[in-house]
Amino acid sequence: MSGGKYVDSEGHLYTVPIREQGNIYKPNNKAMAEEVNEKQVYDAHTKEIDLVNRDPKHLNDDVVKIDFEDVIAEPEGTHSFDGIWKASFTTFTVTKYWFYRLLSALFGIPMALIWGIYFAILSFLHIWAVVPCIKSFLIEIQCISRVYSIYVHTFCDPLFEAIGKIFSNIRINMQKEI
């Protein structure tokens, strides 16, 4: 019944009958088709973003976490006035915070665009150039490896076996004379 219309026992109309085994385009049966329709589809482009923990994989723990105490420190005996120290701390912290925000507002989206394009190109090249080249190389090198294997077993194995037998009979006796 290919190419025609098919009505199942419940009156649902199909253009192509759903076979028991199914195929790559249609689910195996009507029950599975309903399950597929009920499942939520998750798209990698629409996943939720965590606005609280913005570094869940801890990429920048040891690099960018710079606080006032990591940069400026006064050893014992050389302390400035407490007010100056507090003002310096506040100035450093607020400047770092707002200047980072300003830079990310100005350059964040263009840099995200640049890095997105870069990693898209990198992924494209890896998928469409690197992996096929490696697979092609592995296929081509199999022929060479078979020829090399025959060469080794034909010429090198007997040669080195003979050399091994020659040197296996060498005995060294060391005696210490007093």
Swiss-Prot record:
Region feature (Interacts with SPRY1, SPRY2, and SPRY4): 149-160
Residues with PTM N6-acetyllysine: 5
Bilayer-spanning residue ranges: none
Pfam families referenced in this protein's UniProt entry, alphabetically: Caveolin
Covalent link location (Glycyl lysine isopeptide (Lys-Gly) (interchain with G-Cter in ubiquitin)): 5, 26, 30, 39, 47, 57
Record field: intramembrane: 105-125
Region (Interacts with SPRY1, SPRY2, SPRY3 and SPRY4): 131-142, 167-178
CC per GO annotation: acrosomal membrane; caveola; caveolar macromolecular signaling complex; cell cortex; cilium; endoplasmic reticulum; endosome; focal adhesion
Phosphoserine modification, residue list: 2, 9
Phosphotyrosine modification, residue list: 6, 14, 25
Interaction with CAVIN3: region residues: 82-94
Subunit details: Homooligomer. Interacts (via the N-terminus) with DPP4; the interaction is direct. Forms a stable heterooligomeric complex with CAV2 that targets to lipid rafts and drives caveolae formation. Interacts with PACSIN2; this interaction induces membrane tubulation. Interacts with BMX, BTK, CTNNB1, CDH1, GLIPR2, JUP, NOSTRIN, SNAP25 and STX1A. Interacts with SLC7A9. Interacts with TGFBR1. Interacts with CAVIN3 (via leucine-zipper domain) in a cholesterol-sensitive manner. Interacts with CAVIN1. Interacts with EHD2 in a cholesterol-dependent manner.
Family under the similarity heading: Belongs to the caveolin family.
Matches recorded under PANTHER family: CAVEOLIN, CAVEOLIN-1
Name of this protein: Caveolin-1
Organism: Otolemur garnettii (Small-eared galago)
